[in-house]
């Protein structure tokens, strides 16, 4: 679904990937950006980029880009909020793509 990496974790191991996916689902259902609480062990506020990709075709490393938004410097008080906001923006505000629809979320990598 998204490429949000901290350290050397794979997307399946990274709790921030789940956060991004949940933030997108929440926004598509409610129209509101979730405000996730900071957690012990979180990195300090920082810029993040969230990339959404369609499923990869056989022989491809990754699928076609479906949305990508991010910041170089933090705009939010926590990295979790930065990820949530960037994930939602990638899903519905990337001017290169139509807004993501609820049925598409589970299909993204």
Identify the function of each model-found stretch.
Residues 2-109:
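Basic nucleic-acid-binding interfaces
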